[in-house]
Amino acid sequence: MDESVTRRRALFLGGAAVGIAGCIGTDDGTESNDDGDGTGDGAPDGAGGGQDGSDDGTDAEVPLQNVPDSIALDTLVDGLQAPVGIEFSPDSERAYVLEQGGRILALDGSGSLLDSPVLDLREPIVAGGERGLLGLALHPEFASNRQAFVRYSAPSREGTPDGYDHTFVLASFEATEDGTSFRRESEQTILEIPEPQSNHNAGDLAFGPDGYLYVPVGDGGAGDDQGAGHVDDWYGEVAGGNGQDVTENLLGSLLRLDIDGGDPYAIPDDNPLVGEAGRDEHYAWGFRNPWRISFDAGGDGTDLYVADVGQSSYEEVNLVEAGGNYGWNVREGAHCFQTESCPSRTPDDVRGGEPLLDPVVEYPHSGGEVTGVSVIGGHVYRGAAIDGLGGVYVFGDFAPRGKLFASAPGEGGSTWPIRTIAIDGASVESLYAFGQDGEGECYALGSGANGGTVWRLGPAE
């Protein structure tokens, strides 16, 4: 292992498996959501049955009144290359860190990196921009079956149309008994999705409390849900439509797979489109770039948060339900996209006139007290280290020097209030991702003074 990697031993907590939350990547783990289209096209406020745009996250914040003004980010390890995810083993104190360039590294219970990568996929992947090694989830029965699931960007494979940029690959690997290696030769391809553009790849993986694997998929890239690889849909006011299509491809959606029930997978019987028109893998749709997802470890564990990166004006987090349509590209957040007005539901002949659901968390790129550039998701805090955070959704934004937020249901209205939390005791250039250990404590990943860094969230001094 490169000697420039710094080890921090006092901060590490062992724990159970975790979903990953994170950011928008490039070859160094950085990229904004501008898409380079330069249009600046935003959605006018107050149209299409959404929010009127008056809630900028500064309303009375009764559920957030005990949230601390600042949180410390304590360095666990640095000197990494674009860390975009962290996953905790359920059977040991080991944690696995994903580098977007293609390596999975392991931290032992003291916070020290193992000398060799657990898995090195730098050779077979396509990296750069928003591509690369993007997601990892350990099977709920990892302690006994040793199955790890990885998603990455690969050169175009058989079945990917000419002119497409790459192929999304979901694959399984078998871990050694001691968890220090994922056997390269054990790779089994679970799913391949042709990706027309280089961006909007989403990237996360997470097992739900039902034992099924949840897989967010971006809308196919470019800007505005348009360009090569995008299909026509029911909405004629804006071109493109992968986010609103559920029949032609799997783009712009959240998938739900039973990886134990078939070869390579089966469809859960209660997926919303089973027996209906559309691809059975779909669980929810209407997403642009759902970069990171997380389940709340509290209660029954079924609350599912999806952080969806916006186009030019709004960032959003959705509390997702089966069969939910989250609006893209009819709407960006709770606002009409590129039109003065827009419908609040699909036509009756499109899945019975389903509603376009508002996000629970939304903030603008400019013009509000709470602003950002690309939401990177987060977790509901269930730890004990930080007073006042219990039950609060803690998340971040890719803005320069990073932004840390807290949100929870407020008094009235469907959009939750947001509080900005100051970052104490760390030099942060960008935040890429969040993770959570089995004790409910949270971790941030990003770039700092010494390169790619994993921090543990703790109380400010």
PLM-predicted stretches and their roles:
Residues 22-26:
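N-terminal Sec signal peptide cleavage junction
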Residues 279-316:
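Repeat-solenoid scaffold signature
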Residues 82, 132, 201, 250, ...:
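Beta-rich catalytic cores
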Residues 1-18:
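N-terminal secretory signal peptides and thylakoid transit peptides that target proteins
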Residues 62-78, 112-128, 173-196, 232-292, ...:
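Blade-edge beta-strand/turn elements of extracellular beta-propeller
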Residues 30-59:
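Ser/Thr/Gly/Pro-rich low-complexity, disordered linker/stalk segments of secreted
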Residues 154-163, 216-247, 314-315:
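Short, conserved, GDST-rich strand-edge loop motifs in beta-rich repeat architectures
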Residues 53-222, 295, 303-309, 368-411, ...:
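Acidic, Gly/Ser/Thr-rich repeat motifs that build Ca2+-stabilized beta-propeller blades
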